[in-house]
Swiss-Prot record:
Keywords: Chromatin regulator, Nucleus, Transcription, Transcription regulation. Its main location: nucleus. Residues 171-173, 220-223 are annotated as: Histone H3K4me3 N-terminus binding. PANTHER family: SAGA-ASSOCIATED FACTOR 29. Expressed in roots, rosette leaves, cauline leaves, stems and flowers. Chromatin reader component of the transcription regulatory histone acetylation (HAT) complex SAGA. The lineage of its organism: Eukaryota, Viridiplantae, Streptophyta, Embryophyta, Tracheophyta. Belongs to the SGF29 family. Residues 128-273 form the SGF29 C-terminal domain. Residues 245-248 are annotated as: Histone H3K4me3 binding. It comes from the Eukaryota. It comes from Arabidopsis thaliana. It is found in: Nucleus. This is SAGA-associated factor 29 homolog B.
Amino acid sequence: MSSPDIVGILENTKELDRLRKDQEEVLVEINKMHKKLQASPEIVEKPGDISLAKLKNLYIQAKELSENEVTVSNILLTQLDLLLPYGPTGQQRRKLGVVAEGNDQKRKRMKVDSDVIRLSPSMRNQIEAYASLKGEQVAARVTAESADKDEWFVVKVIHFDRETKEVEVLDEEPGDDEEGSGQRTYKLPMLCILPFPKRNDPSNTQEFPPGKHVLAVYPGTTALYKATVVSTPRKRKSDEYLLEFDDDEEDGALPQRTVPFHKVVALPEGHRQ
């Protein structure tokens, strides 16, 4: 291995470290903005507020840093491949021929594991959280970004792909379908999935205060709609919220409906209904 080769590899490893540190800093700022908007969502309606524009720029930075990290990682892999000896010989070659299929599976696992290692700690934790959702019901947005309205439904997680970061879900009750197509599956990005609070752990569940806008399962359906909190489970001494759903007007007024706390989640930023 020549000195120039070593120098090039070391320079790229330093660049990789810098990119990861920059990503950590950007993610910290993104989390700060999320907390700010969750605490005071009405702030975006104030004249001159640039919170959403700032958040968008932060996501653009995060995306660029992530793409640069992938580029540098690929360069490093190429540099290392060029320095490694070509192929095994003798006993090694015969052994690899016997276990080629097993090694292929191992390489696939290693690729997924290395992808996770390159991610920030917060993103790794998020990926583990989504991987643990298999078999559970979640809220899923099944409409495209370009759609006029967001449609959210209760679905069941059947698989999480760590490599593509996609969640495969099953809509067990697709609604009234004249063709009777039955259950339907979707592959959705993580951003389209909202985990529900744990039914058996109400004490560790975030409670939304009166007046807060939320996304909740409409009684008797598997669809979620925007609603306003009227009363909390704690105040009602029960496990249900008292909510008023948008566009649910009856006789000139919005009826108040009860919804279990484990079917209520935070309203996504930019929700369209």
